[in-house]
Amino acid sequence: MTIAVAMSGGTDSLFALVLLKEQGQQVCGLHARFIPPTGHDPVPDIRAMCDRLGVDLHVVDLTEAFEEHVVRPFMEDYMVGRTPNPCARCNATMKFGLLADAAAHVGAVHLATGHYARLLRHPRWGTVLQRGVDPAKDQSYFLSLVPHARLEKAVFPLGNWRKEAVRGELARRSIVPPLPSESQEICFVPDDDYRAFLKNRRVRLPGPGPIVTTRGRKIGSHAGLWQYTEGQRKGLGIAWHEPLYVVGKDMENNMLLVGGREALASPGCVAEEVNLLVPYEDWPAEVAVRIRYRQQPLSARVTLRDGRLYARFREPQPPAARGQVLAVYDMEHHVLGGGVILGPLP
């Protein structure tokens, strides 16, 4: 039984390959080109490393599909005022979608990645996604949109590892990753500057408009709604008698809505594009949710109605950004499901 390991050239995917090989698994490397090389092409270095480890490497070109399924929706989301999460979309459509298909095409039964998350077997639910043990690197949030059937074929060797230990074990083996530095937040956005990326792509974005308080008072002008995210404080460019936060975006009237800290209190959010990883009838009444990465889970009650998730927080929270992911957990850190945030509770 062959396991294909998605090889980016970085520390995590390389150690995932090393671990599986040392466990006696039959493995091969699989590298996907998601974006055209703009500088140094990592493939020769990845191939050399695989040769050193005695592993075959397969390279698949997915640049056109990545543009269609990840980059284009990313740009379209900003055009309508959303704050997209391209990594979650990439996991669902590319890594565990088309790349997993490519793994099957080369004869692999499973696809392993360097994600910091765990997969467990449950007597009723089958494969269950669970948070990784390293709280600083846990990536279960980004995996909550991956269909259950795809997770059944996934392997996460690093789920029980911490990043510092991974680096140390590679060093102990005298293995240097081809790309030893941490990858940037969004792989296709140079320097993580999404504003420059959108401008370079000549995306038609909403222009300047008024900044209005929650009481209806105009207090300034914004540079374009696409440049702001719900809950944002910095970058408003307004001197005011109290700190101001973005509390909403009125796309129809091109208005940026701001208010003080008290205006941030949101009772919950609604999510669409729902992905159930555990049958909804098995969800507990009280769950934990995350509405942004690196956030401590929030106690909430979540209902599924008409294909949408309605999350009501136990304590009011800053508003959830439209386009981000709502990930739902039980108290044992199993991921019950996820969705794309549509807006606040009605």
Swiss-Prot record:
What keywords sit in the KW lines?
Answer: ATP-binding, Cytoplasm, Disulfide bond, Nucleotide-binding, RNA-binding, Transferase, tRNA processing, tRNA-binding
What is the protein name given in its UniProt record? Answer: tRNA-specific 2-thiouridylase MnmA
Look up the domain of life of the source.
Bacteria
Record has Plastid as a keyword = no
GN (gene name)? mnmA
EC number(s) on record? 2.8.1.13
**Where does the record place the region Interaction with tRNA?**
137-139, 292-293
The UniProt entry's GO biological process terms, in alphabetical order, are: tRNA wobble position uridine thiolation
The catalysed reaction is:
S-sulfanyl-L-cysteinyl-[protein] + uridine(34) in tRNA + AH2 + ATP = 2-thiouridine(34) in tRNA + L-cysteinyl-[protein] + A + AMP + diphosphate + H(+)
Q: Where does ATP bind?
A: 6-13, 114
Gene3D superfamilies for the chain: Adenine nucleotide alpha hydrolases-like domains, HUPs, Translation factors
Q: Which CDD domains does the record associate with it?
A: MnmA_TRMU-like
Q: Which organism is it from?
A: Nitratidesulfovibrio vulgaris (strain DP4) (Desulfovibrio vulgaris)
Top EC class for this record: transferase
Key word Zinc-finger present: no
Q: Which cell locations does it reside in? A: Cytoplasm
Q: Which GO terms describe its cellular component?
A: cytoplasm
- Residues the record marks as site: Interaction with tRNA: 115, 324
The record's annotation in HAMAP family points to: tRNA_thiouridyl_MnmA
As for what it does, the entry says: Catalyzes the 2-thiolation of uridine at the wobble position (U34) of tRNA, leading to the formation of s(2)U34.
